[in-house]
Amino acid sequence: VLDWELSTLGDPVADFVYHLMMYRMPAGLFTGLAGLDFAELGIPSEEEYVAAYCQRTGRDGLPDRDYLSVFVVFRLAAICHGIRGRLARGSASSAHAEATAAVTEPLAELAWSQALAARL
């Protein structure tokens, strides 16, 4: 089963950066890892993970990473906002709709703080 809502044809780096979002999201917010001790957990740091991705894909780096990091978090906030709308209309199908809708603002705030930090 495929979920076409999030399917894209475009820059594969955007998909990788979407995956990196877990490093910047607070623990307890979806699959957020921010603030956890990666070494203790045996998880590579964000920089180590990016370096491994670049090595395996033959890239010198991810020059648009800051922009894409902000974009993917805002995109997730927009998706959560859509779920909030479905919840308000009584058409939300997920048992987790209420919890998902509740993180709209925290995600938007995270994206905005990343934009400010990156001076975008």
Residue ranges and their predicted role:
Residues 1-2, 14:
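Activation loop entry of protein kinases
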Residues 13-57, 72-89:
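Active-site activation/catalytic loop segments of kinase-like enzymes and analogous catalytic loops
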Residues 52-55, 59-63, 110-120:
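C-terminal, non-catalytic tails of nucleotide-sugar-dependent glycosyltransferases
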Residues 60-72:
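All-alpha amphipathic helical-bundle segments outside canonical DNA-binding/catalytic cores
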Residues 84-120:
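Regulatory N- and C-terminal appendages and interdomain linkers associated
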